[in-house]
């Protein structure tokens, strides 16, 4: 039994490492592809559509052709009232986020992403899924102050890029809240493959509208570099990232995932300054981000306490692994209740869809 637990723990940390590598890699890869200074494919909507098309195609093969995964019962009413609005905001968050790469550095983007819990909390309060609380509000103020300080210290500050990134953050926050509000009412449970199957094509359609207006008129085929292997590997990495998120969720607890997320952000900031020399980090950048990070950590601590208050008998990781092994749960069943891991670079809806019908707890996480 001890050997089984040790082996499982090793696998858990391997999955965490894979998640950190893939998440950082996809962000850096997208920046490299889109940046005029490098691969020079300044078409963020087109790149996002490639991700959506590839993801939807893979999901179709797995469900309809190879029948590896069974389809879920999806009615027209659920599709229109749930999948369509969620897909719209999901597509918007990816579009805005990828567009930001054209204007601001990866390091500054990661610092701005510290606003994610602020945006999610505000959207949750507006939609009635969370209550305004003084302790959380103070954390949100701390995060906001940190981001403002970090922005003030940004040497290459760009208003357009900053606005796009903030819009992407709020679109993603609204997507998370809508996922909870809409799908929870329907009791719908989707795993990563079935969520790909329904979300990706719908997101592709939504993206085609701004693409037709903003990018199609400016596309000069003779000046565009289209390397099949570059785009294939880019889409494949994005797809692999989502599945790594699913594996991590099934094997770790809330604290571990949050620590991994913070570690990933710091690694990404450091790597981006090495890979993209034009990315300059100032002392004020670091100070502001550290302030914001304190607020994020305190916010996560409060949310973890909320989860433990509702589930006072939560098992430790080894105990939960042993319990899951004894009960022979599937990887989907091993997902910790009330936990949501979100990564804006993943090309589909993440963990909330895999357990939305089994929990009444909305716990929002910034990754």
From Swiss-Prot:
It is found in: Membrane. It is a multi-pass membrane protein. Pfam families: TPT. The chain crosses the membrane at residues 9-29, 43-63, 76-96, 106-126, 140-160, 163-183, 193-213, 229-249, 257-276, 280-302. InterPro entries: Sugar_P_trans_dom, TPT_transporter. PANTHER family: SOLUTE CARRIER FAMILY 35. This is Probable sugar phosphate/phosphate translocator At1g48230. It comes from Arabidopsis thaliana. The lineage of its organism: Eukaryota, Viridiplantae, Streptophyta, Embryophyta, Tracheophyta.
């Amino acid at each position: 039994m001890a050997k089984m637990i040790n082996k499982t723990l090793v696998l858990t940390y391997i999955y965490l490492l894979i998640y950190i590598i893939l998440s950082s890699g996809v962000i850096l890869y997208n920046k490299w592809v889109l940046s005029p200074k490098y691969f020079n494919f300044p078409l963020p909507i087109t790149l996002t559509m490639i991700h959506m098309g590839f993801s939807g195609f893979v999901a179709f093969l797995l469900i309809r052709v190879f029948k590896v995964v069974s389809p879920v019962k999806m009615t027209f009413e659920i599709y229109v009232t749930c999948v369509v609005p969620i897909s719209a905001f999901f597509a918007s968050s990816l579009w805005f986020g990828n567009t930001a790469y054209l204007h601001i550095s990866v390091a500054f983007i990661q610092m701005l992403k510290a606003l994610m819990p602020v945006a999610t909390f505000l959207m949750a309060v507006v939609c009635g899924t969370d209550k305004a609380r003084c302790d959380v509000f103070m954390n949100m103020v701390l995060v906001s102050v940190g981001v403002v300080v970090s922005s003030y210290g940004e040497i290459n500050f760009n208003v357009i890029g900053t606005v796009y990134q903030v819009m992407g953050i709020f679109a993603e926050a609204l997507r998370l809240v809508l996922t909870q509000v809409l799908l929870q009412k329907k009791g719908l449970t989707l795993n990563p493959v079935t969520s790909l199957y329904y979300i990706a094509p719908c997101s592709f359609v939504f993206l085609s509208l701004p693409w037709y207006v903003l990018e199609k008129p400016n596309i000069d085929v003779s000046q565009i570099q289209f390397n099949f292997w570059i785009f294939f590997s880019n889409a494949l990495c994005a797809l692999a990232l989502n599945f790594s998120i699913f594996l991590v969720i099934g094997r770790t607890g809330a604290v571990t995932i949050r620590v991994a997320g913070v570690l990933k952000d710091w690694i990404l900031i450091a790597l981006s300054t090495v890979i993209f020399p034009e990315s300059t980090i100032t002392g004020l950048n670091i100070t502001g981000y550290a302030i914001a990070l304190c607020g994020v950590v305190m916010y996560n601590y409060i949310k973890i306490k909320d989860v433990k208050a509702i589930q006072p008998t939560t098992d430790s990781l080894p105990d939960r692994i042993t319990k899951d092994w004894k009960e022979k749960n599937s990887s989907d069943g091993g997902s910790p209740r009330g936990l949501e891991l979100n990564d804006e670079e993943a090309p589909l809806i993440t963990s909330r869809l895999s357990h939305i019908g089994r929990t009444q707890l909305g716990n929002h996480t910034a990754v």
